[in-house]
Amino acid sequence: MKKIFIIIIFFISLNNFGQDEKVIKDLFDSGFTESKAYSWLDYLSNEIGGRLSGSYQAQLAVEWSKKELDKLNFDKVWLQPVMVPRWVRGPKEFALIETEPGITFNVPVAALGGSVATPSVGIKSNVVEVKSIDELKLLGKNKIDGKIVFFNRPMDPKFVTTFTAYGTAVDQRALGALEASKYGAIGVIVRSMTLRNDDFPHTGGLTYGALPISKRIPAAAISTNGADKLSGLLKIKPDLKFLLRQQCKQLPDAQSYNVIAEKKG
């Protein structure tokens, strides 16, 4: 009797799973074909614009999201208070390559989210190009100390799924400054995480982990065209110098909100 009961429960569970699976698929299908997702994304991206955590635009996005969700048939929509990091980019960043005194090439850069600033005059030093954190570790302090580390591993275009290509390259952006600081680097430049060849630096966040503030080094993304130029010039002039200036800063955490919509069932 016990075995029969277990078998009945098993088949009921399978049946419920099948129903749940169909409901979930229907929701996805509806979202792709009938929803306002693209118009919402357009408004969020182009009308509200950049939404760094703790910023005025981020608060506008919270208010707008709740307003839109209130129009839909949810049982409850509410705001959940949360404190978020508040980092500001400051004035436009500046960088140049100096192959020899008086001969320079400007390159597009942008500070990585969460990075510390350079001194007001910037940092200027020789460059060590690496393709991975493992390569950085192999070079060690003797070859890294006092220099700017240039992480230049491109995303792999052979991956059909772009996000897979991104995932296999983004460690150098997220962890590059943390790892390079261990070997005495004074700054980090990271190739932008994109398959495009252009002059627009693509930023993103980094982490310093538990590294004391006094040991944190500035980090910036360089455009893919800029990265190719720097790499090419390093082959000709290995002793060239790189100047980076950025004035970003970390402010106290700010109040923000998670926007939550609940549908009971």
Tell me the role of every PLM-derived stretch:
Residues E21-V23, E98-E100, N106-K141, Y208-G265:
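Soluble metallo-hydrolase cores and metallopeptidase-like ectodomains found primarily
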Residues D26, K36-S39, Y43, L60, ...:
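Extracytoplasmic/secreted proteins, especially bacterial periplasmic and envelope-associated proteins
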Residues I4-S13:
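Sec-dependent N-terminal signal peptides
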Residues G31, S45-L52, S65, L72-K76, ...:
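Sec/Tat-exported extracytoplasmic proteins
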Residues K131-N197:
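A conserved hydrophobic secondary-structure block that centers on an alpha-helix together
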Residues E21-S55, F200-G204, Y208:
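N-terminal capping segment at the start of a domain
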Residues D42, N46-V160:
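Noncatalytic luminal/extracellular "stalk/propeptide" segments of secretory-pathway proteins
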